[in-house]
C-alpha cells in the first residue's frame, strides 16, 4: 500500500473530488479556528495591530506536519485583513519570471501564499529577497554585455510561506519572515470540536461520543479527522439510519482498519518490521524503507512524526528503535 492510498494519509490525491467539501467546512475566521490557541491569540494581535496602522501584515512563516491547517490559516489571515490572497507553491515557481508575474499583480496589503516554500529554486529565492525586504523587484533585461537591471516598485504585501520542513529553508529566506508560527498536533478535545463543527456544516446527525471516537483515531490531524468523518458518514448511511453514535463510528473505523491509536496498515507494518525483522532496532532509514516497500521521504515526513510524538518510535544516531510502548501495543514480548 503506497502512501497515497492510505485513508489516514495527511495528503491523498485519491480524494480530490471532495476538495469542495473540504473548502466548505474550513473555518474562515480566527473565531472559528479550533485548537492552536497560542497561534490564534498571537495572530489576532498581529492582525489588529497591522489594521490599526493601515499596514500590510508582516511576512509570516507557518510550519509543522502535514494536515494541521497551514493553508487554512493563510486564508484566515487574508479574510481577517480583508485583502485578496494569491496561492501558489514552491515547485510551480520554476523561473524568476513566474514569481515576478505574481508579485506585479498584487494590490496593496494583499497576501501571496507559497506552499512548500522550502522547494523554491535558488534563482527564485534571489528575486524574493528584495521583494520581501524593500518591496522592490529586480529584473534583468537583455543578455550578455547589453544586459541591465531595472527596479520595479511593488505595493506593500504579505508573504505567507508554509512548509513541513522549516530546517530546509535557507537562512536568508527564513530570517526575512517577521512572524513565525509552528502548528502542533491537535489535542483530542480540539479535534472533537472540529469534527462536531464539520458534521454540523455537512448537516449530519452526530452525537458528541461519535465525534470523540473519530477524533481519538485521527492522529492529531484535522485533515485526517474530516476524511474519517466522511467515511463514517458513508457507513452510517448504508448500514444504519444516518445517525452517528460512538458504536457506529467504532464499527466504521474498524472496517477502515484504523485502530484505537489511529494506526493504519502502514503504521503497523513499520513498527512490526522494526520489532520482528530488526529485533526492535536500531535500524537505518534505508533498510526500513526497503523492508516495508515505502519511500524514505514518506517514512520521514508522514509515518514517523506521529509515531515519535506518541512515544512508539525513537530516532537515534544509530537508527530507529521501537519503544516499550510499541511492544505493549502489539502484545509482543521484548
Swiss-Prot record:
Please give the name of this protein. Answer: Holliday junction branch migration complex subunit RuvB
| Location in or out of the cell | Cytoplasm
Q: What is its EC number?
A: 3.6.4.-
Q: Which Gene3D superfamilies match?
A: 1.10.8.60, P-loop containing nucleotide triphosphate hydrolases, Winged helix-like DNA-binding domain superfamily/Winged helix DNA-binding domain
Domain free text: Has 3 domains, the large (RuvB-L) and small ATPase (RuvB-S) domains and the C-terminal head (RuvB-H) domain. The head domain binds DNA, while the ATPase domains jointly bind ATP, ADP or are empty depending on the state of the subunit in the translocation cycle. During a single DNA translocation step the structure of each domain remains the same, but their relative positions change.
Q: Where does ATP bind?
A: 25-26, 67, 70-72, 133-135, 176, 186, 223
Keyword Flavoprotein recorded: no
